[in-house]
Amino acid sequence: MRQSGNEQEVIILGSGLGGLAAGTLLSKNNRSVLLLREKRYQPSYPTQGYHFVPFSNFSEKRIGPSFLKKISNALNLQLLMGNREEVKQTRISSDQSKQKAAFQVVLPKSRIDIFPQRSLSQKEWKREFPKEFIEIEKFYDELNQTQHLLQKVDRKKNASSFFPLRKHSLISGLFPFDSLPKGKMDEKLSPFSRAFREFIQLQLISWGNLFSERFPVPLAGHIFSSETDALSIDVDLEKLEKEIVSEFLRSGGRIEEIDKVKKINLGWRKGFTLSLEGDPRVFQSKFLIFNSPLHQISSLLGKKGKELLKWGEKIRPLYVMIPLFLGVREKVIPVGMKDLLVSMLDLDKPYDNGNVLFLSLSPKGDETKAPEGRRALTVESMMDVGKWEETLLVDYQQEVMKHLYHIIPFLEHYTEFVDFQWASDHVPNWSYSHFLYKVTSDFYWREGVVPVKMSKNIYFVGKENFPYLGLEGEIFSGLSAAQEILKNESWPNFIRP
């Protein structure tokens, strides 16, 4: 049923990938959907012939062909599915990409490439961790066996191929006949050196947004499998987002830009009424989907938002990720440096204050991202969430640059510009979603941390649902929310191939 004006069936507050996926699926099923997007927030930054896109994790930079196929099937994105010849070329490209590193991990005394092929990775482990090589082989064998077991269990249960979800039930809670290993990664890694433990930990947080020393072993196996599947094809987060927005609008969805929601009132019959700051417009809907960081919107419902506050206590942002943009000359990039890289300068220090950096280089020769002979370098560092207001960005930038000079010698002589202005302008916004989270209690990784359905007609879609899964978790949450609203009894059929 379509409605007009400022009354609609569903309002989505925020414009992340999860919300866009939910809105597109709902619109395709003839539901009236309004997406409210923050006017001041720009997800990318074009300047001086360069094009920068801040990111939360590497899953936003490398979208694997199998994952892309699932999204395309779920939302019927024809431009992403392509014709037979394009699919054939993608398979050829994927085969060639198996010889290329997905990304690179840099430690004080090590530089390790992550390859899709086990034989290539073995050479890396043997070179950088020769004394532990035999035990490392056994460690990866166990992870592979766990992943195969997970796939076997889900095939028997006819589970969703999008993500190995386990639906919660009273019976499964009382009698958890789950044959997957119950161990945690800190226990598995305890015999290894500090360097190898950090090597594994950095990989786990590089693909998602959760910091934890106690990752469940099956979850680690799933994440490593996703990393090696993410072979380089010509689709990144920005391109995917544009295609989903186009499909959302084609299906009848609407987008309005706002400054900020002032208050949300919940009426017994009329549903939700949203009033805005500095704007006379009022929006009403039956269903409400929050698609902004939980800690940014938990107070909007006042006393009726107890569920938001409760789950906001279970998962909290530990670090805010701060982007720094550099225009650099191609000749300064070291031989062997990959386009995606995570680096830790000091193993004995925390991750913040420039000690851990995530780097993303624009593809060599891509003049849509940087002028000829130049590269766009996006650097994500971490800052304690509580220190943003009191930190001088000039001093903070110096710490980040010291680390960068260590990774890229002579960088200061080949840098066109360094830009921190986008971060200064955008980090305070309610749409800013680049955080590394921590959980305050145990969770079932196959059920998620924060539920998609908060209470009657209120849904939450964001990184906090499945913070360890990166882009996969966001898309899955959005599609799940839409499926709940559509009241389809099956779970969720639309994401099967």
Model-derived regions, located:
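N-terminal glycine-rich phosphate/pyrophosphate-binding loop and immediately adjacent elements
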Residues: 2-148
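Short loop/edge segments at beta-strand edges and connector loops
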Residues: 37, 83, 241, 257-259, ...
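General small-molecule cofactor/ligand-binding pocket signal
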Residues: 80-82, 254-256, 416, 459
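Active-site/ligand-binding neighborhood in enzyme catalytic cores
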Residues: 144-251, 258, 435-441
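A glycine-rich dinucleotide-binding beta-alpha-beta segment and adjacent secondary-structure elements
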Residues: 197-207, 410-468
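C-terminal segments that line or cap access tunnels to active or ligand-binding sites in enzymes
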Residues: 329-425
